[in-house]
Regions:
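Helix-to-loop junctions at the C-terminal end of transmembrane segments
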Residues: 70-80, 303-314
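Extracytoplasmic gate region of multi-pass secondary transporters
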Residues: 36-37, 249-300
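Conserved small/polar residues in nucleotide/adenosyl-binding loops
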Residues: 346-348
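Intracellular cytosolic loops and amphipathic helices of Major Facilitator Superfamily
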Residues: 1-8, 195-251
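Glycine-rich segments within core transmembrane alpha-helices of 12-TM secondary carriers
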Residues: 145-173, 187-188
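C-terminal ends and interior cores of transmembrane alpha-helices
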Residues: 90-108, 325-337
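Cytosolic juxtamembrane N-terminal segment immediately preceding the first transmembrane helix
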Residues: 1-31
């Protein structure tokens, strides 16, 4: 039954709808993830935060992400990709919205500690978005398209940070940092979109023995009548393995380490960048947000560029080119750390 996906010549409108929904999910949830960098930049002077307090606020989501990835991956295998996706979107949106009620620096629970606690939950929820939406999309897509589609789904991650920068630049003087946290509730819209637009993964349904539901899900993806799809006469065999067996594959371990290194660099720039601009260069929080917009625009352009190269060059060479260019630019950036080009800092 699933082999019908592999015979596709081009993606259907429903498959594109799924890809767009996943992109929107990444954009909105990474808005919530990176918003804290701009809020911390504003609070650094307002609350006279120490380096330790500011650092803990920015680090907190990273504490919640690793266990979150394991948890949501496990949950997605047990209750379904779609349901886990919805729950992760709810988690990150509510955790961000609750920070509207952050007490002041002298409250019973100091404001910085309140932010640390709920940022852990933001990281926990965000790990689910990244862990679940890729398998969900891939299981609706033919194998020969998965590399390209996976790259496309993550293309708008920096756009979430860019939107956070735009919102902070324009709205911070009007609604304050608490108002920015309320905007973080917007990902709840995703819950309704996913609930009504996206069915459960046909591969997961087949693995659970729910063949009729799997047929309807596959028919939705292919945009055909479910009656045109024949049910398999036998259930697919599922081999149970322990997660630790993944470490038997050296290439998988190497890919995981490289992913961790690249994610660390990207996360550091997005979250720590605005605060460092305020602390080191003395910019205003609003101007720091404005400058970060250009960083994130270049990140979006770069992701589209690499995505376009995947089919002609292949996945390995595209990834190699990306890593080499990133390494060269990091060296150049470090060498010219005190040189500014483009926009003048006169308007700080």
């Amino acid at each position: 039954m699933i082999e019908l996906l592999e015979r596709q010549k081009k993606l259907t409108a429903n498959q594109w709808k799924l890809i767009c929904t996943a992109n929107l999910a990444d954009l909105l949830d990474f808005f919530d993830l990176f918003l804290i960098g701009y809020v911390t930049a504003a609070l650094t002077k307002q609350w006279s935060l120490t380096y330790l307090q500011g650092g803990l606020i920015l680090l907190a989501s990273g504490i919640g992400a690793p266990p979150g990835a394991f948890f949501w991956g496990w949950l997605g295998d047990h209750i379904g990709r779609r349901t886990a996706f919805i729950l992760s979107a709810i988690t990150i949106a509510l955790a961000t919205g609750v920070m509207y009620f952050t007490p002041g620096p002298d409250g019973l629970i100091p404001g910085w500690l309140f932010l640390v606690i709920f940022r852990v939950f933001v990281g926990l929820g965000n790990a689910g978005i990244y862990t679940i939406d890729l398998p969900l999309v891939q299981e609706f897509i033919p194998a020969y398209k998965r590399g390209w589609v996976s790259a496309l789904v993550t293309t708008l991650l920096p756009a979430g940070s860019m939107l956070a920068g735009l919102a902070s630049w324009q709205l911070l003087p009007l609604i304050g940092w608490r108002g920015l946290f309320l905007i973080g509730l917007v990902p709840l819209v995703l819950v309704f979109m996913i609930r009504y637009w996206v069915p459960e993964s046909p591969r997961w349904l087949m693995r659970m023995g729910r063949l009729e539901e799997a047929r309807k899900s596959l028919a939705w993806a292919l945009m055909v009548d479910p009656k045109e799809i024949d049910l398999p006469t036998t259930l697919p065999t599922v081999e149970k393995t322990r997660w630790i067996e993944l470490f038997k594959y050296p290439k998988l371990c190497l890919a995981g380490m490289l992913t961790g290194l690249t994610q660390t660099g990207g996360f550091a720039i997005g979250v720590w960048g605005p605060t460092l601009l305020v602390l080191v260069l003395g910019t205003s929080p609003e101007y720091a947000a404005f400058l970060m917009i250009f960083v994130n625009v270049s990140a979006v352009v770069g992701r589209f560029f690499i995505t376009a190269l995947i089919e002609p060059l292949g996945r390995r060479w595209s990834a190699t080119l990306c890593l080499v260019l990133g390494g060269i630019l990091m060296v150049v950036q470090g060498y010219y750390y005190n040189v500014f080009i483009g926009l003048s800092l006169i308007h700080i």
